[in-house]
Amino acid sequence: MAPHRSRQRNPRFKLWRYDDEPLAIAETMPELRHLKLFGNGLTNLRLEAILDNCVHLVHLDLRRCFNINLLGDLEKRCSERIRDLRRPDDSTADSPFDASSDIYSAGEDDYDFYSDDSDGTLSDHFEECKTVSVATGNESVYVLSFVRSDNFIYPKKIASSSSLSSTPLPSLMKDKKLRNWAELPSKLTSSILLRLGAIEILQNAQKVCKPWHRVCKDPSMWRKIDIDNRNDRAAFKYDLESMCRHAVDRSHGGLIEIEIWYYGTNDLIMYIADRSSNLKSLGLVRCFPITDEGVAKAVSKVPLLEYLEVSYCLFSGESLRDIGRSCPNLKTLKLNRAPEIMFSNSGFDDNAKAIAESMPELRHLQLLGNGLTNKGLNAILDGCPHLEHLDLRQCFNINLVGDLKKRCFERIKDLRCPNDSDDDSDDGSDNGAVTTFGSQFNETDYHWY
């Protein structure tokens, strides 16, 4: 009998969206013998890649992989190569992730994420259904099993060469003596989960099981916060500012590094600064609501800061001087694509002069699209004697000729000139991501239990 469903429903999500996991398997796991991709969205092309690279594969489960079309040469190749082949339309009756489950959904159907009922029955059932077998990208991995739930992969069991070296693989598979990931040591679990972003941890990973939830609440998990919404439009459905505040609270003052794209505000960076006296790295990219005064005020509370990146924010020379005086250890400054609303050459050089006067310890300076002139550049070279990396791309008021050109090339180890390509810049200048935010965020979702 299906567990009782609470009437309250959270948003619905599509199960399968990506084809990159099979490619990663093909590229990094040549020793695979057993591969289960139950309900995966891989295509024929990715299946070919797996067959090309996983040359020892003998068991392949493709049930509910409805993007696969096993016909012609591909069908022949699979049948000849794979000893135990489960096809997309084969029965799932023997699978613990049977498509008839009240929570599991097959094909392109929507997936319902229900809230807990009063006695917790549904929570236990859902936790059981969404835990799956998975292995990390290790060349010695023999057994790998993926079952997709929402857009997140939940691991449960793993077997690698270290655990199989003294046990014949078929015997081990028969007895199902695989490691339960919920029983892994906390340090190892933490090491694995740290590879996820904050969104994945708060929205998914901490809800897998109680041991993972405990690890996800540990302050050591929040030394670095990167709520990366650059290439994921789905991320904008969340209240990212509230999510960021919650992540900062979990750090308990231990936050070292944070990067914010689009959703930063003066209030948010002040909230971070008030609770993160050990902060050493702060990135604010395309956070249009912030002001130079707001950044300077927040930065004054984090004197250990060594790295600061701000883009699309107009800075006055005085605000930059305040930052330099507040952060004597500042080694890297990225001040990119400031709005060009100043018109005189002296105004263009205000930032350069402030940097030269207040940031003598700089090693890395990036000024993409800045309006400084040769005079401002000379001031920086005079005032920042340790400068090794200087990025002047799209600084078209600079004329690198004669003595100035010679001085730059002799002094600067890594020099990017005004006309150099900026294709590799990572300041969001060509990112077309939507800059409006949703609010599908519930603080209780993060605490869970």
Swiss-Prot record:
Q: Which domain of life is it from?
A: Eukaryota
The UniProt record lists the F-box domain at 178-225
Q: SMART domains per the record?
A: LRR_CC (SM00367)
Q: Which UniProt keywords apply?
A: Leucine-rich repeat, Repeat
Q: Which CDD domains match?
A: F-box_AtSKIP19-like (cd22164)
Cite the GO molecular-function annotations of the record.
SCF ubiquitin ligase complex binding
- A Pfam family (short name) is F-box-like
* Membrane-traversing stretches: none
* Positions of LRR repeats: 14-37, 39-64, 261-286, 287-311, 312-337, 344-367, 369-394, 401-427
Its recorded name reads Putative F-box/LRR-repeat protein 23
Organism in which the protein naturally occurs: Arabidopsis thaliana (Mouse-ear cress)
